[in-house]
């Protein structure tokens, strides 16, 4: 069972029928799985190659250099370098299911988070230019590429759901999204609790745009058989994996699914306990709405006025509710 793959050129350059079909298939797959893969995006292959190069270079820096951009011990500002184990996503595993998390899964991952360059509420944290020349400028430029791609996908979803084209975009007037580089250090299989490098969780925002290497291990929960996970493998490092975040699930009253996902031992191989898993690298852009917009369900998706989400929280309040748990 494989997650569907779409060709972005059908949306970007195709005729009216190709455009319509892309939007329809995008929404149908996100309704069924919450995940989809998109090839031939607006992000050039050469940029992705350089992105992974910077990813490896940054995490290979000595710890005292990465400490210059250290994420605080507190949840905010959610910026900078987090050491292995500093964040614990397993604490929010059952958040959107209204379930209490019953198992702590240690995280074997370090990360680097950044937001928009002009975000005054949560300013970015950077290492010095001499520590990794060109890193900051490149990452800021890549962030803008993701912002533009995210914007186009929101238009496509509005079309696929027969909503006004700018309905979703109107809730993204200020740039509050985040970009994260991940590094999963090599580790012996016997040291992984439940075979996981990070525990299951869902994402906070509207859409996540993920690039990953070929190491494998990403799994998504089957929305028709909760508790069962299937692998999400990339055919190439240039393929963008797109998944629905909690805010988009809430707006659509669960029409589009924010599926739990995790990083597990790759399937299809019997690992010995002393076998060492290779380093794993990925980069995720978390598209997020304006901080002051409500994340209640849209009336268009509430048959008979029934809504699963009517707690009148805005996006920042919702984001903080989950973030405070992960960095508790």
Swiss-Prot record:
Residues 175-289 form the Fe2OG dioxygenase domain. GO terms for biological process: small molecule biosynthetic process. It comes from the Eukaryota. Keywords: Dioxygenase, Iron, Metal-binding, Oxidoreductase. 2-oxoglutarate-dependent dioxygenase; part of the gene cluster that mediates the biosynthesis of pneumocandins, lipohexapeptides of the echinocandin family that prevent fungal cell wall formation by non-competitive inhibition of beta-1,3-glucan synthase. The 10,12-dimethylmyristoyl side chain is synthesized by the reducing polyketide synthase gloL/GLPKS4. The thioesterase gloN/GLHYD exclusively interacts with gloL/GLPKS4 to maintain turnover of the polyketide side chain. Belongs to the iron/ascorbate-dependent oxidoreductase family. This is 2-oxoglutarate-dependent dioxygenase gloF.
């Amino acid at each position: 069972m494989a997650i569907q793959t779409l060709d972005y050129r059908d949306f970007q350059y195709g005729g009216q029928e190709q455009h319509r079909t892309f939007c329809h298939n995008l929404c149908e797959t996100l309704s069924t799985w919450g995940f989809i893969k998109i090839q031939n995006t607006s992000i050039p292959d050469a940029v992705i190659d350089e992105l992974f190069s910077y990813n490896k270079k940054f995490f290979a820096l000595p710890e005292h250099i990465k400490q210059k951009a250290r994420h605080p011990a507190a949840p905010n500002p959610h910026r900078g370098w987090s050491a292995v184990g500093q964040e614990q996503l397993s604490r929010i595993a059952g958040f959107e299911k209204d379930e209490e998390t019953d198992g702590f899964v240690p995280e074997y991952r370090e990360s680097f988070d950044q937001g928009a360059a002009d975000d005054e509420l949560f300013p970015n944290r950077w290492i010095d230019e001499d520590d990794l020349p060109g890193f900051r400028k490149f990452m800021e430029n890549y962030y803008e590429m993701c912002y533009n791609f995210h914007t186009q996908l929101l238009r496509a979803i509005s079309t696929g759901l027969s909503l006004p084209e700018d309905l979703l975009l109107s809730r993204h007037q200020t740039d509050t999204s985040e970009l994260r580089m991940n590094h999963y250090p090599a580790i012996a299989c016997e040291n992984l609790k439940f075979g996981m490098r990070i525990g299951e969780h869902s994402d906070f925002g509207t859409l996540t745009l993920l690039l990953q290497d070929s190491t494998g291990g990403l799994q998504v929960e089957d929305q028709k058989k909760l508790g069962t996970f299937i692998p999400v493998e990339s055919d190439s490092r240039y393929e963008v994996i797109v998944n629905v975040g909690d805010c988009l699930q809430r707006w659509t009253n669960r029409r589009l699914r924010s599926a739990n996902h995790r990083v597990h031992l790759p399937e299809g191989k019997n690992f010995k306990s002393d076998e060492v898993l290779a380093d794993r690298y990925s980069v995720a852009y978390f598209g997020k709405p304006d901080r002051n917009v409500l994340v209640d369900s849209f009336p268009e998706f509430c048959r008979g006025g029934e809504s699963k989400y009517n707690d009148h929280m805005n996006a920042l309040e919702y984001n903080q509710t989950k973030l405070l748990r992960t960095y508790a």
